[in-house]
Amino acid sequence: MKLTEAYHDALAALPATPPLPTAVANATEAAAGSEEGKQDGFSKVKVKEKFMNELNKIPLPPWALVAIAIVAIILGLTCCFCICKKCLLKKKNKKKGKEKGGKNAMTMKDVKEMGKSGKEQALKDEDEDAETGLTTDGKEEEKEDEKLGKLQFSLDYDFQNNQLIVGIIQAAELPALDVGGTSDPYVKVFVLPDKKKKYETKVHRKTLNPVFNESFIFKIPYSELGGKTLVMAVYDFDRFSKHDVIGEAKVPMNTVDFGHVTEEWRDLQGAEKEEQEKLGDICFSLRYVPTAGKLTVVILEAKNLKKMDVGGLSDPYVKIHLMQNGKRLKKKKTTIKKNTLNPYYNESFSFEVPFEQIQKVQVVVTVLDYDKIGKNDAIGKVFVGYNSTAAELRHWSDMLANPRRPIAQWHTLQPEEEVDATLGMKK
């Protein structure tokens, strides 16, 4: 009995032994995993070794490789930063748009009301302009006229000598045409329709309210005076370019009472462009050394010369005369520049002029067109020195005020006949 019971107990105990195979399976799996891990580790090491070998093959020093790596990292960081910033800005803009849309949202009724109010306001403005008799163009013209300034002058007539006496007293509230916020004004005075005789005041530097106090005489018989018109044009002087006209005042002589001296202010109006034939401009410098009695004239260049040849060009050269009392003392000339209307010379000429004579001489500059066959025709002329006016007088005065220093200036060429008449030259 005891043996049978023990046998049965042994049989009952047999099912409790299955955990042994699972442990063995786990052990085998762990062993396999460890083998795979070892293989992965070996493969990683091999990749690193290959990478380092490839790096060693590159013909660059280690510090260069380090620098490249640093630059790459910095670029990556900056790209990330920019992307983050853009995302944040987009979110902010969306929020702002929503807030504005909520606050400033308009209905169709609001739009219609705004349209009606705008139309009503425009009609009111038009009615106001109609009442005052002004259009928008008129307003602009008035503003332009106001900016031109005004001129004070006097008029008198000498019946015994048949002379019209014009006094240019002063100007006020002139516009600023120079960079420094001022102008260099002077006044041209002439009588229409002939324009034969023109006068110019002295140039006043850096002022918008110049005081001239200069008088000019025109010899006109009283019987012819009624058909004349006096023109007083204010200009802004510029040494290196064309003088800008500021404005002008026109006075028909048949509207003036010459029974007494007339003195009045006139607002300057927009001046008409002078329709004078353009002969060109010339630039030259003047230098005077008083101790040596040496006057140096450098002919620099000319521009926009009149076309004298059939082909639409010229062969210009320049003559320089030193004159006194209508007599030519010395003569110089430049080289000839072929087929051009804008010649460049940069040629220097010297004259001996004692200090006591410098105020009595004149330098006459003539631009001529060279011709092989016929006579060389004069294109234009200008003179500085004694008896010169306006820009020419200013150039001469600046030279005397700055001894030993070359003073360059552009001059507009005048017709030869007019200059010769002023100089009293005999051909």
Swiss-Prot record:
Residues that bind Ca(2+) 4: 309, 315, 369, 371
Record-linked InterPro entries: C2_dom, C2_domain_sf, Synaptotagmin
Biased composition (Basic and acidic residues): 109-124
UniProt-annotated stretches for the region Disordered: 96-145
Transmembrane segments: 58-84
Required cofactor names: Ca(2+)
Keyword field contains Transmembrane helix: yes
Organism superkingdom: Eukaryota
Record GO terms (molecular function): calcium ion binding; calcium-dependent phospholipid binding; clathrin binding; phosphatidylserine binding; SNARE binding
Protein name: Synaptotagmin-A
Main localization (coarse): membrane
Family designation: Belongs to the synaptotagmin family.
Expression by tissue: Forebrain, cerebellum and neuroendocrine cells.
Membrane-topology descriptor: Single-pass membrane protein
Protein species of origin: Diplobatis ommata (Ocellated electric ray)
Pfam families assigned: C2
Residue ranges constituting the C2 domain according to the UniProt record: 147-266, 278-411
Described purpose of this protein according to its UniProt entry: May have a regulatory role in the membrane interactions during trafficking of synaptic vesicles at the active zone of the synapse. It binds acidic phospholipids with a specificity that requires the presence of both an acidic head group and a diacyl backbone.
Keywords for the protein's UniProt record, in alphabetical order: Calcium, Cytoplasmic vesicle, Glycoprotein, Membrane, Metal-binding, Repeat, Synapse, Transmembrane, Transmembrane helix
Stretches for region Phospholipid binding: 141-387
Positions bound to Ca(2+) 3: 238, 241-242, 244
Glycosylated residues, chain numbering: 26
Cell location: Cytoplasmic vesicle, Secretory vesicle, Synaptic vesicle membrane; Synapse
Key word Membrane present: yes
Binding site for Ca(2+) 1: 178, 184, 236-238
Lineage, broadest ranks: Eukaryota, Metazoa, Chordata, Craniata, Vertebrata
